[in-house]
Amino acid sequence: MKRYLTILAAATMLSCGGRQAGYPVAGEDHTVKIASFEEFQSYFRYVPGRDIIISAHRGGMQEGYPENCIASCEKTLSMMPTFFEIDFSFTKDSVMVLMHDLTIDRTTNGKGRVADYTYEELQRFRLVDRDGNVTDYRIPTLAEVLEWGKDKVAFNFDNKYINTKGVGEAERRRALDYYVEQLLPGGAWSEYHNIFLSVRSLDEALYYWNAGVRNAMFCIEISTPEQFRAFERSGIPWSYLIAASRKAMDPAMTEIYEKLHDRGVMVIVSITGSADRVKDRRDRRVEYLRTLLSEPDIIETDYPADFVGLPVGREELRAIRDREAERMERSVCRAAGLPIACRAEIRRAASVRPESRRTPAGSSPRRECTPCRRRCGCVRSNGSSKAAR
C-alpha cells in the first residue's frame, strides 16, 4: 500500500502538469455536443490512445449531493467530463421518476413504495445524501433530467425492473414495452441522441432491437468467449455495443478485449462493488489508480469527483506503469546481489506465460542470465548461493 501511495502522489503531480482530462468530444466546459445518433456512436467508439472516461454511477455522490439528482449531475459535470448512469421507477400515476429502489426509504426522508405515491405526493419528500443528511432537493422526473442533459451529456439508462427482486412478470414486460414506446419514432425519447441502455442479457437487447429500436446503444456483459460469440451471432451491429466486463480487465480476457477493440467497441468496468467500497478516501484513490493502470476504456464509479487529479491519459498511465516495473526490476536485482544488467533478463522472464516456465523432470529450474552469466535470482555476485526474495 505504501508503494502505491508514493505512485499515487507522483501520478497526481503528473496529471496536474498536463491536462486534467482531454476526451476527444468533451469541450472546455466538460459538456459533450451531440447532434445526431451517429455522433453519439462516434463518442463511444474505441480509438487507440484515447483517454479513459469516468462515468458517474447514479449521477455521482458527494457530501450534500444525493444520488439520482440533477444538482448532483451538475456538480459532477462542473468538475470533470463524464456521463451519467441513472435509474428510474414508475409512480402511481405512471410518471417516471429518478429512483434506484422500488421504495423511497433509503434515499429520501419518506417511507413506502414509489408505486404507491403519485408524482405530486412524492414532491413533499426530500432526497438524502449517502450519509443520510436531508437536502433541499426533490425527486426529479426522467423528463426533467433528459431535458437538462440535452446537448450536454450522455446517459446510461438502467432498467431495474428487469431483474429486481419483487418485480412481477407483468411489471417487467411493462418496463420493456415502455422503453420501446419511448425510443421508437414519435416517442418521448426519440428526440434525444444521447442514450444507451444497460441490459441484463443479450435477450433483453434483442427484445428492443427486434421491436425496431435503432437510436440507442446497448451495454451488454461480455466476460467470456461464449458471450462474445453469442453477440457476434445476434445480428446487432458492433457499432451499437458497449461491452461490460464483470472483472476489472481480467488478464484472461485479453484476447477478447483485443477483438472488441478491433471492432471499435469500448470496454466498461464498474467499481461500485469493489474499489468504491474502500472507506478511507486516500486508500480508495490508490485503488482507483490500480484500476486506471489496467486501462479499461470506461470506469463506472459512485465517486467520480475522487478521480479528479488522477491521470486518465494512456501515455501518462503507461509511463507510470513502466517506471514501477523498472523500480521492481531494480529491487529484484539488488535483493539478489546482481548487476542492474540483469533487469533485461528479469523482464523477459516476467513476460513468459506460466505454463512455459514449468521445468521438465530431471532438469534444473535455474537459468543463466545472459548479461552477467549468473543464475538470475539464485546466486549473488559474491558467489554465495541464496535465492532472491
Model feature map: region roles:
Residues C16-C342, E368, R375-C378:
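Phosphate-group recognition and catalysis centered on beta-loop-alpha active-site segments
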